[in-house]
A protein has these predicted regions:
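Cytoplasmic helix-loop-helix junction between adjacent transmembrane helices
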Residues: 109-146
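Glycine-rich segments within core transmembrane alpha-helices of 12-TM secondary carriers
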Residues: 138-163, 354-364
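Helix-breaking motifs and short loop linkers at transmembrane-helix boundaries and internal kinks
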Residues: 46, 78, 99-105, 133, ...
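Conserved MFS/SLC helix-loop-helix module at the cytosolic interface between two early adjacent transmembrane helices
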Residues: 65-101
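C-terminal ends and interior cores of transmembrane alpha-helices
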Residues: 88-101, 296-310
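Cytosolic juxtamembrane N-terminal segment immediately preceding the first transmembrane helix
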Residues: 1-29
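Extracytoplasmic gate region of multi-pass secondary transporters
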Residues: 35, 220-272
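Extracellular/periplasmic helix-loop-helix junction of adjacent transmembrane segments
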Residues: 35-65, 258-259
Length: 423
């Protein structure tokens, strides 16, 4: 039975795909728990809406630091080792959140959890982009992002189950304690997944890694700035919805935990299919045009969802497209950013752009929390998200087209990077 691009993958490509897919999925389960339990944290720990926004910001700042830091490390000790480390890191600090007794405790743990998640996303994206051949890279690397939807679905599914067995004051702690489970994935990665052959070849050719500032040198500066700005817009808009949508459904639309889970299920279903559509489209019309198309679609969808009067049935449909368009945008950054840099600085470049986008974009959900004190939550969410998507669209205009790029040719055309490594 033929399964499209999956049937065309080799054994190592398939194992790498599942390792990266699983890493995204299980880390997603851990990180999305926070947005789901914000109402419980407000009720049981007494945190305010602005403080809830600061929790989201702390994770994104941590992801910014962790993305670049893990990227720098992956360019030096290997993609596979860092991937394992980041998965364990996220699982551990999600578990520690179960024992928090105050807002300040949660803030610290959330920051540290973000370090691992930012690193895993960056390094996993580089690994799958290097292992898969150019003709399939867009579809396969983008499909890894669908793991995020799976992880989100698991956390949403766990919430009503945990709530039915435990009171609200304890339920959120149990949910965080379950976040230790992704650590099991590391045993699979250690046993079955090979290191990137492109990385191994580059490491043999030059054992010394270039300095951290190499991604800002020469022609890489323009790529780094444009990619980081686009990432800022995409993640800023996404985290408005991830952080505040559960609260919006329960406070503005007056849904119960069970009722809001149904709405979120449609959002998650869209997030599962969006990356598959983007990957197929980007391998045909190119990365840039695909980004611009989905940014326009998402901006229109968000405007209708949050700023226009719509009935319950329409809201369910819009939830699906909200997840689909956002999943598509997030997935496209994995192959695109990997195709901008030579192997010796690929992980640090992708780590900075993805992590920087999360960090700079962290002001967006925090701004929602501040604006929501004096404005309707939907208005605050919609205005902030639309500004973020506008920034991403402008940045996409500046990026070069990279679809189908041979990563070996990038290495051959970047002798200056190797000279930097010698200093």
């Amino acid at each position: 039975m033929k399964l499209g691009w999956y049937s065309a993958l080799t054994g190592p490509e398939r194992r790498t795909f599942w390792a990266c897919f699983g890493g995204f999925g299980l880390d997603s389960m851990d990180t999305t728990m926070y947005g789901l339990v914000i109402p419980s944290l407000i009720a049981t720990l007494g945190i305010s809406r602005p403080e809830a926004g600061y929790l989201a910001t702390a994770a994104l700042v941590g992801a910014a630091i962790g993305g670049w830091g893990a990227g720098l490390l992956a360019d030096r000790i290997g993609r596979l080792r860092v991937l394992q480390l980041t998965i364990l890191w996220v699982a551990a600090f999600t578990f520690f959140a179960a024992f928090a007794t105050s807002f300040s405790h949660l803030l610290v743990v959330r920051l540290l959890q973000g370090l691992g998640y930012g690193g895993e996303a960056a390094v996993g994206g580089v690994l799958i982009s290097e292992v898969v051949r150019p003709a399939l890279r867009g579809r396969v690397a983008a499909s890894v992002q669908s793991g995020y939807a799976l992880g989100y679905a698991i956390s949403v599914g766990l919430l009503p189950i945990v709530s039915s067995f435990f009171p609200e004051a304890i339920g959120w702690r149990v949910l965080f304690a379950l976040g230790i489970l992704p650590a099991v994935l590391v045993f699979f990665v250690r046993r079955l997944v090979p290191e990137s052959s492109i990385y191994s070849e580059a490491k043999k050719a030059s054992a010394e890694a270039p300095p951290f500032w190499a991604i800002f040198a020469g022609p890489h500066l323009r790529h780094t700035v444009a990619a980081a700005l686009m990432s800022t817009g995409i993640f800023g808009g996404a985290y408005v919805m991830i952080t505040w949508l559960p609260t919006y459904l329960r406070s503005a639309l007056h849904l119960s935990i069970t009722g809001s889970s149904g709405y979120l299920a449609m959002n998650i279903l869209g997030s599962l299919f969006g990356p598959l559509i983007y990957g197929w489209l980007s391998d045909r019309i190119g990365r840039r045009y695909s980004f611009m198309t989905f940014l326009l679609l998402q901006a229109g969808n968000v405007a209708i969802y949050l700023l226009a009067p719509v009935d319950a049935g329409t809201t369910v449909l819009l939830n699906f497209f909200l997840g689909a368009f956002q999943g598509a945008l997030a997935s496209g950054m994995l192959p695109t950013f990997a195709e901008l840099y030579p192997t010796s600085i690929r992980a640090s470049g992708q780590g900075f752009c993805l992590g920087g986008g999360r960090g700079f974009g962290s002001v967006v959900p925090a701004s929602v929390g501040i604006l929501a004190v004096n404005h309707p939550l939907g208005t605050a969410m919609g205005g902030c998200a639309l500004c973020a998507y506008a920034l991403a669209f402008v940045a996409a205009l500046v990026l070069p087209e990279t679809s189908g790029t041979d990563l070996h040719r990038i290495d051959a055309a970047a002798p200056a990077i190797q000279q930097m490594a010698g200093h």
